[in-house]
């Protein structure tokens, strides 16, 4: 089995909300580069948890197409700005934040009052501009999730003046990968995987790749030891075939065979209705014939008749 190494060959930060790293994974067997690259890309984009504002209640506002006196932006623009706010939850739970600013002022994320367990990544993100002495007051809900959460228009939150936001939980903004052939020291053709990861600053690309690897490992671990349950249908078919076997196949003595026939026992299925005690009580059968039948069933078909007497009478 090939053991590969991973190395971060480039890492930059162009801002508080734009982290980038480039990784190299090698050596891989042929075909593994695309397999691993695609799995990591999907996991990085879809399965990592992030934190975002999901709903906002603004004082004096009833719907997202409203305007607020003294505020340069309309409500829809404010919601779009709040959608871009990057947060990080230390314990992965939801919370409630607030904002109250009196103008004139330029409102940024630095004005947000957040729960202690939630961290603001960029305090300079723009939210709105207040003209004059007007007040912008709002309350917003913060949640942790995965992927992209579309607004549910019929949610109960609309009844209490909360305006929902299309929340972007994804801490990873973009992933690229490239697989190419390389030659080993033994002149074997192997593969090198290059992985590029961009994040929003709430997580380092290195940590993101590490989390993605852990998620994939936990996902695939059950496949390491697979214990398939037997197919019940196959067992039923096998039992059906055995039950259809005629008593002629048991190669019994003439006496035992004739006694069974007179008792209307023509197949193994008929015999299974009897216990060992029931066989002895068949007319003219006796202990010796019963033992012969019991022995034939056990040796030829692996069937053991119960010893106790059943309710069947002959």
Curated annotation (Swiss-Prot):
Residues 1-227 are annotated as: Alpha N-terminal domain (alpha-NTD). InterPro entries: DNA-dir_RNA_pol_insert (IPR011262), DNA-dir_RNA_pol_RpoA/D/Rpb3 (IPR011263), DNA-dir_RpoA (IPR011773), RBP11-like (IPR036603), RNAP_asu_C (IPR011260), RNApol_insert_sf (IPR036643). It catalyses: RNA(n) + a ribonucleoside 5'-triphosphate = RNA(n+1) + diphosphate. Keywords: Chloroplast, DNA-directed RNA polymerase, Nucleotidyltransferase, Plastid, Transcription, Transferase. It is found in: Plastid, Chloroplast. Its main location: plastid. One of its GO terms (cellular component) is mitochondrion. Pfam families: RNA_pol_A_bac, RNA_pol_A_CTD, RNA_pol_L. GO terms for molecular function: DNA binding; DNA-directed RNA polymerase activity; protein dimerization activity. GO terms for biological process: DNA-templated transcription. HAMAP family: RNApol_bact_RpoA. DNA-dependent RNA polymerase catalyzes the transcription of DNA into RNA using the four ribonucleoside triphosphates as substrates. This is DNA-directed RNA polymerase subunit alpha. It comes from Pyrenomonas salina.
């Amino acid at each position: 089995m090939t053991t590969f190494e991973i190395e971060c060959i480039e890492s930059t930060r162009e801002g508080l909300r734009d982290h980038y790293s480039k990784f190299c994974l090698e050596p891989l067997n042929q075909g593994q580069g695309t397999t691993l690259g695609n799995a990591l890309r999907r996991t990085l984009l879809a399965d990592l948890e992030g934190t975002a504002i999901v709903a906002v209640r603004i004082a004096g506002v009833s719907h997202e197409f409203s305007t607020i006196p003294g505020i340069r932006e309309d409500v829809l623009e404010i919601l779009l700005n709040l959608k871009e706010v990057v947060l990080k939850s230390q314990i992965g739970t939801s919370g409630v934040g607030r904002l109250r600013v009196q103008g004139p002022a330029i409102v940024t994320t630095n004005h947000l009052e957040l729960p202690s367990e939630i961290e603001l990544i960029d305090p300079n993100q723009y939210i709105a501009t207040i003209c004059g002495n007007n007040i912008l007051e709002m309350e917003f809900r913060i949640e942790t999730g995965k992927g992209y959460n579309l607004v549910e228009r019929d949610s109960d939150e609309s009844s209490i003046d909360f305006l929902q936001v299309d929340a972007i939980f994804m801490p990873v903004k973009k992933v690229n990968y490239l697989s190419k052939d390389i030659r080993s020291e033994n002149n074997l053709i192997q593969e090198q995987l290059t992985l590029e990861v961009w994040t929003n600053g709430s997580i380092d690309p290195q940590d993101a790749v590490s989390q993605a690897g852990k998620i994939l490992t936990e996902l695939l671990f059950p496949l390491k030891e697979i214990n398939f349950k037997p197919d019940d249908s196959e067992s039923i078919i096998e039992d059906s075939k055995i039950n259809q076997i005629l008593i002629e196949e048991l190669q019994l003595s003439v006496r035992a065979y004739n006694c069974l026939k007179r008792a209307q026992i023509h197949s193994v299925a008929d015999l299974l209705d009897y216990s060992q005690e029931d066989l002895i009580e068949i007319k003219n059968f006796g202990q010796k014939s019963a033992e012969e039948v019991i022995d034939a069933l056990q040796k030829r078909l692996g069937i053991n008749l119960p010893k106790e007497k059943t309710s069947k009478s002959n």
